[in-house]
Each structure stands twice: as C-alpha cells, then as structure tokens.
C-alpha cells in the first residue's frame, strides 16, 4: 500500500502550518514543497503508514463515517478523499468536501493487495460503537438468509396442503 498526499498552500496560509496538518495525520510522510508561483505552492508526499489515521478514526468514534467516505472514493485499486486542513492541524480527522482547500489523500493498493481489505482495516464496521468482525457478520447474515428461505418453503408447502384440503372438501 502507498499513500499519496497533496495539499495546496493558499496565499493566506502558512506553508509550515499546512505541513504540520499533514504530519499530524501521516507522521511518517516524506513531504516536498513545490513552488507553483509567487502566490502559493503545494506540499506533496508519500507514506506507507496509515497507523495514525486509524488511531484517530477510532479515538474520534467516526469509523462508520470514515468507511462510507473510503467506499465512496473507491476505484479498482485505490480510494481517495479529502481531509480538512484546520481539523488536521489540531490533530483531528474531518472529511472535507472542499476539493480546492483540503488535504488530498489517495490510498493505492499494491498489485497483490485488495483495496477493500485495506478499507476494512482502516475503518472496520461497528455495531453499537463496537468494532465487529465482518467475516463473522457475513456468515451470520448468510445463515439468517438461509433460515428465512427454509421458513418460506415451509409456508409454501403449508399453503399447498391447505389448497389441496380445501379442494377435496367439495
């Protein structure tokens, strides 16, 4: 897995505060500042670690919201989203819809990795605020579906019997 990070620095922003915002979420990121023109530039970087992001999502109890954002931004082998700079500056995760001012994050799966598995690791599903094992949940749902189908067949058989009973009573 590789994480690509980009954040534009507007003329009204301090480039080092923007850098701090990125490093608060991705402390192991290797960042480079690229001058775009006299007015602003952009921080670009990469990391392989999402540990701090995972920790913050859990401590802020926003795993389900994060999961929705990660799934919404998912492509075949990646997911992308934006983080709010101001929130990141104070060490918090807040997903941003402002594509012009946020921190752009793209998580790329390696060839032998499944992006959905990475998303499940970063933001697992919860039930009542507790992380649940999705594999067990899927097995449980399949079992419930199977039982519902069996019940449906029993009801159909009972209906057939009743129809036969009613027709023979004439």
Swiss-Prot record:
InterPro entries: PAB1135-like, Ribosomal_uL5_dom_sf
Annotated Pfam families: RNA_binding
Biased composition (Acidic residues): 133-148
Biased composition (Basic and acidic residues): 149-163
Region annotation (Disordered) ranges: 133-170
Protein family: Belongs to the UPF0201 family.
Name the record gives this protein: UPF0201 protein MJ1564
Originating organism: Methanocaldococcus jannaschii (strain ATCC 43067 / DSM 2661 / JAL-1 / JCM 10045 / NBRC 100440)
